Amino acid sequence: MLYTLSRSPYACDLAALLRIAQHGDDLLLLSDGVIAGLTGSPAACALGASPLTLHALENDIVARGLSAHLSPNIAIISYTDFVRLTEKQPQQMAW
C-alpha cells in the first residue's frame, strides 16, 4: 500500500495511519505533509518507529525551506520517483 500524507501531522489522524501500516508499505509526505518529517518532531519519531518506508517529495520540502531539517530516515524523492512508487504499490490511500 502507498499512503500519501498531504496535510500537516497536526491536522490529521496520524495515529490511525500508523495503526494500519504494515511491513512493505510506503508513505510519501507531500505538500504540508512534509512537516511530519522534521527531525526530532513527535511525528517524525512515530514514523521512524513504524514499519513504513518513508519518502518525501523534494519540491515540497524545498518550497517550505525544510531541506536542512528533514529526518535522515526519510528518502527525498522527485516526481519521477513518485510515479515509480505508484507503479510499485498499485493500492493507494490518501491522508
Swiss-Prot record:
Source organism, top-level taxon: Bacteria
GO cellular component annotations of the record: sulfurtransferase complex
Pfam families for this protein: DsrH (PF04077)
Annotated localization: Cytoplasm
Record's subunit section: Heterohexamer, formed by a dimer of trimers. The hexameric TusBCD complex contains 2 copies each of TusB, TusC and TusD. The TusBCD complex interacts with TusE.
PANTHER family: PROTEIN TUSB
Name of the featured protein: Protein TusB
Species whose genome carries this gene: Sodalis glossinidius (strain morsitans)
